[in-house]
Amino acid sequence: VRFRAPVAVALAATLLTGCAQSVDPIERLGKKAAQRVRPHGPAPEQPYRHWGLTAPLAPAPKPSPGPPARSAGPGLPPVVDHIRTRDRVVFLTYDHEASARRDPNFTDMVRELRLPVTEFGTAQGRRPVAGLPYDAQRTEICGHLARPRPRLLRPPDGTYDTTTRRAAADCGISALVLWRASTTTGTLTYARGAHRLTPGDIVRITPTDTTVRLLRGIQERGLTVGRLEDYL
């Protein structure tokens, strides 16, 4: 079993936090010179159209998390599949087996649409740690976490027990992240609650080629994509 940090797959954190925009050569010519310059060729296609969306994704609001997730016991990290918030956002998460970072189309889409997604780097072929003794679980979790240590953990297959939470807490984990909705069958399925996307839902996406279809559904519900780390 190998655990790695959840990473914001915006192909560098600058895409999530904002970076200095490039200066177009026409801007450097000055206003009068720029008026004499006419761009050549057709206008570039808007990224959202290139990826099959009819409108750009709405920008995520300034995060306003609700009450913190409740822990099942003192010192134990909470297990979350939904964030309590009034913000109309959902959270897109990917496991390692989705090959999100190995799919060039996926990484291009994330970069061009500036999607704040989270990948949990749990290695393929891993077995659940639930049921193992404390020392074994702690070794698996602490021993294989990437540096710097992550705050969030997705246990293999989403299975865990109280020992998993104790071991995770001792490894510096602040929350175990599951999902309320998933696309593992190619369509959205729900672990509990309403059979529709609702604000605060955490979505597990695999395979990655279902992302665009999901984004259309998110827009139809009047939602957008938020950054999970801003709410946990």
Predicted regions mapped to residue ranges:
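Post-signal peptide N-terminal segment of mature Sec-exported envelope proteins
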Residues: 29-55
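His/Asp/Glu-enriched short active-site or ligand-binding loop at hydrolase and phosphoryl-transfer sites
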Residues: 159-196, 223-232
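C-terminal motif of bacterial Sec signal peptides marking the signal peptidase cleavage site
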Residues: 15-18
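CE4/NodB-like, metal-dependent polysaccharide N-deacetylase domain
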Residues: 109-116, 134-161, 195-204
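Bacterial signal peptide processing site
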Residues: 20-22
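N-terminal export and membrane-targeting signals
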Residues: 1-11
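Active-site beta->alpha N-cap acidic-glycine motif
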Residues: 49-136, 232
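Acidic (Asp/Glu)-rich catalytic clusters
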Residues: 106-113, 123-124, 130, 168-170, ...
